[in-house]
Amino acid sequence: GNHYTVEDKLWKGGKVELTICSLTDTQGIILKATAENLPSDARLCWAFGACDDKVVKTEQNDAIPTDACHDNVFCTEGNAFTVYYGEVMRLRTVHGVMPDGPEPILCDAHQQNNPLALYRSGKKTDTPVIAALRTWQEGEPLYFCLYKQNAKADYNRFMLPALFDKEIKNNP
């Protein structure tokens, strides 16, 4: 898998470790995130969007390119979601499973000045994304999975730790 360390002066010496693996049974990824020495009031805001078959080039400095969000339709159920995108007769889907915590909400991709602004932006938009805000305890691993569903790949959050362990062995 690919491993990344993220540090920020706001975290006062804390850091976030990310390990990302591709999935062997379908197109997709699983990500494990852990935190060390974050302030006790640290919260994680995650967001997802911009499903599009086209490569979108943008001059904006947005983490999620707004041009790729226009035709995204989200269906959430707890901490799982499905994104429908593409042309009406050729709809495609991406499935996602996120950690426990508050259910994801619709947000406005135009409002990416900072994570909290995106989270609080509201659902009236022509560029929908989903986001959630949750507390994060030191040593608590968080798992995220994005994938194309098929007969071998239909995941829920309880499966993610074992799925990550399997994929890290396949993608050292």
State the predicted function of each range:
Residues 11, 15, 23-30, 34-172:
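Acidic/polar, glycine-enriched structural segments that form the non-catalytic walls/loops
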Residues 1-3:
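A eukaryote-biased signal for short, well-structured alpha-helical docking elements
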